[in-house]
UniProtKB/Swiss-Prot annotation:
Description of how the protein assembles with itself and partners: Part of the 30S ribosomal subunit. Contacts protein S5. The interaction surface between S4 and S5 is involved in control of translational fidelity.
Gene Ontology terms: biological process: ribosomal small subunit biogenesis; translation
PROSITE patterns: RIBOSOMAL_S4, S4
Domain of life from the UniProt record: Bacteria
Protein name as it appears in the record: Small ribosomal subunit protein uS4
Function of the protein: One of the primary rRNA binding proteins, it binds directly to 16S rRNA where it nucleates assembly of the body of the 30S subunit.
Gene3D superfamilies: Ribosomal Protein S4 Delta 41, Chain A, domain 1, RNA-binding S4 domain
Gene that produces this protein: rpsD
Keywords: Ribonucleoprotein, Ribosomal protein, RNA-binding, rRNA-binding
Family per similarity comment: Belongs to the universal ribosomal protein uS4 family.
Upper lineage: Bacteria, Pseudomonadati, Pseudomonadota, Betaproteobacteria, Burkholderiales
Amino acid sequence: MARYIGPKAKLSRREGTDLFLKSARRSLADKCKLDSKPGQHGRTSGARTSDYGTQLREKQKVKRIYGVLERQFRRYFAEADRRKGNTGENLLQLLESRLDNVVYRMGFGSTRAEARQLVSHKAITVNGIVANIPSQQVKAGDVISIREKAKKQARIVEALSLAEQGGMPSWVAVDAKKFEGTFKQVPERADIAGDINESLIVELYSR
């Protein structure tokens, strides 16, 4: 599956907010002007962004945050729309329940991209079974563990140390000494951090 491999900071500048693609603990705000579009001096425009443009930008932002491409994102939205309740909230819950995201939220990877790589390289088990599909949906009660051979990887140890200092989400329980965590429950909307306006995405797909 094709993925963006260019400068991560450029994507955050394009969206005007830190997407935390380089680190979950260190903001880019001190390193670059997030309110300035990519380009030598930042692209400017006097034209007002249309409603469609605003909705499209929000969708692009969420896709980049979670590292999901268009076709897969559409499938997530279709599933969210089929489920009972708020479609936008359902969408975010599906994205947050991805295995790569849960590995990231538990602090085993410093970014979602790094967490995705750990999953793809078979460094992760779910309930004792090796899992290598980043998009696998994690269920309440599932136990996520780092495989024995990967526990000494410096990047995992460092990421977990930083995550412990910053605090874990309330919907995961992590035993750092065991390199293991439990997905306690699907997070409620209030538990999902991030500058996201999911209603704009619902409006976009409802056109």
